[in-house]
Amino acid sequence: MKVAADLSAFMDRLGHRFTTPEHLVRALTHSSLGSATRPDNQRLEFLGDRVLGLSMAEALFHADGRASEGQLAPRFNALVRKETCAAVARDIDLGAVLKLGRSEMMSGGRRKDALLGDAMEAVIAAVYLDAGFEVARALVLRLWAARIQSVDNDARDPKTALQEWAQARGLPPPRYETLGRDGPDHAPQFRIAVVLASGETEEAQAGSKRNAEQAAAKALLERLERGA
C-alpha cells in the first residue's frame, strides 16, 4: 500500500519502517472508527501488552541480578502501566496519527492517556508482526531507555511513600482535598491539596483525581525530604 506522508513521518519518529504498513494502520485505528471492513486496534493492543511485558521483564531481570521479585515487580509495573505507555506515545507524537471516530475526536481523544496507551501497545504489536520479537524488543528498549534508567524513582508510589513518612513520625495518614475542577467535560483538570496533620501542604493539578493526588503527594514528599 502507498504510505501517506503523515504515516511515513510517524515511522521515522518511531524508528521502524514497515514492510507491511497495514499493520501500522490497524494499530492506529481506534474502535470508535473500526468497522467490518476497517479492523480496529483492540486485538493488537492485547498482543502488544504481552510483547511489552516480556521485553521489560527480561530487561529488568538482567539489569539487576541482585534484585528480589519484590523489588522487580514495582519497577515492572511502573514501566508498563497505561500512563507510561501514554507518555512514550506523546514522545513520538502518536496522537497526531491516531485514527478516531468523530465523537472521540471531538472529546479530545488524541490527548487521552487511555487511548494513547492502548495505541502504543498496538504499535508495538504491529512492529512484532512486521519484523519479529527481536526488532520489537529493541524498539521498546530504545523508546523506554530513559524511563528504565530512572525506574526506581518512578516505581515509588508517592501516596504510599508519603503515608509511610507520616506514620514513621507518629502522624495520621495524609488528607486529600479537592480544591476545584476546571476545563471542559472532555478534558477536566482537578486541583487537589494534600495536607499533613503537622500542617505541611502542597497542591497539584492533573486530568484525573488520582494523578493530581499522586502529583501533590510527590511534591510534598520531595519538599519534606529536602528539609524545606
Swiss-Prot record:
Name the principal localization, coarsely classed. Answer: cytoplasm
GO function terms (MF aspect): double-stranded RNA binding; metal ion binding; ribonuclease III activity; rRNA binding
InterPro entries in alphabetical order:
dsRBD_dom (IPR014720), RNase_III (IPR011907), RNase_III_dom (IPR000999), RNase_III_sf (IPR036389)
Q: What is the relationship between pH and activity here?
A: Optimum pH is 7.5 at 32 degrees Celsius.
Positions annotated to bind Mg(2+): E45, D118, E121
Its needed co-factors are: Mg(2+)
Ranges of residues in domain RNase III: 7-132
Which biological process terms from the Gene Ontology are attached to this UniProt entry? mRNA processing; regulation of gene expression; rRNA processing; tRNA processing
Boundaries of each DRBM domain copy?
157-226
Phenotype reported upon loss of the gene:
Loss of processing of 23S rRNA. Full complementation requires both lep and rnc genes, suggesting they form an operon.
> Could you name the Gene Ontology cellular component terms for this entry?
cytoplasm
User: Which SUPFAM superfamilies does UniProt cross-reference here?
Assistant: dsRNA-binding domain-like, RNase III domain-like
Q: What else is known?
A: The protein in strain DMS 938 / 37b4 has 5 other sequence differences. In Rhodobacter species, 23S rRNA is further processed to 16S and 14S rRNA species in vivo, probably by RNase III.
Q: Which NCBIfam families match?
A: RNaseIII (TIGR02191)
Output this protein's name: Ribonuclease 3
Organism (species): Rhodobacter capsulatus
* Gene this protein is translated from: rnc
